[in-house]
Amino acid sequence: MLCKKHFLYFCALLKLYMLNMNFYLSQIPERIPKPRKSGLTMIMDKGLSIGEVHNFMSIGAPHVDIVKLGFGTSYVTPNLKEKIEVYQSYNMPIYFGGTLFEAFVIRNQFKDYIKLCQNYGITYMEVSDGSIEIPHKEKCDYITELTKYGTVLSEVGSKDATHIIPPYKWIELMQAELNAGSTYVIAEAREAGNVGIYRGTGEVREGLVQEILTKIPEEKIIWEAPQKAQQLYFLQLIGCNVNLGNIAPNEILALESMRIGLRGDSFFFYLDKK
């Protein structure tokens, strides 16, 4: 019969196995295991080859929750179907970037967009209006319609740095889109992290973020955070299970290490904490 000490050690080893860790360290924060609904990492694929996707998934799959095929890259990607099938072979949810959705909408090809997703077996879809103006009721109607075909993510915020949205409006838009059927709302930042919830310098608009969190559940927001300092801010504010997006593929292990206090920037976050 196992003593309590041995039982706890066995449980720790089992947890390591489930979370794809290689050895035991005490005082490591608990990451929600996959498949998870919060603590998500969304990767932005801006043009990986099929071989690079294989290599990336071989190390990244345990730590990645969703992959976005960035902006309109899907239109010009060679062997797109085969590339998508590689991701799908790892049971990895993928979706076309919101800019591609907008490209279909502005050309009055919304039904073609639905067919595109169906043809490629895509069951995650992003609705955004960062490049074009869509009346918000119409945007919410798109969200509701797409829920018939899969999981919808909707992006709030403009790609135009001169278009400043006040905090109350961010909250209003996010609430309406969640009510329309979005599973998550994405806080816009672009791949550079210099618009939307950030200033042009990349600095977080802290007042905006904290006001949003007074009304919108943290587990329903994916914060685009391509820069390390931005990721660190949200880890400090919300914790290791914050949803982060627009992460570069080659940063996945670095981010996961920082989430759990194994990078210099977050080294002391969880020591002496259970």
Question: PLM ranges: what are they?
Answer:
Residues 123-197:
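Conserved anion-binding
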Residues 23-27, 210-274:
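C-terminal alpha-helical cap/extension of soluble enzyme domains
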Residues 38-44, 65-69, 94-98, 125-127, ...:
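Hydrophobic faces of well-ordered beta-strands that scaffold small-molecule active sites
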Residues 74-86, 104-111, 131-150, 164, ...:
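Active-site-adjacent beta->alpha loops and helix N-cap segments on the catalytic face
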Residues 19-86:
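Conserved N-terminal beta1-alpha1 strand-loop-helix module at the mouth
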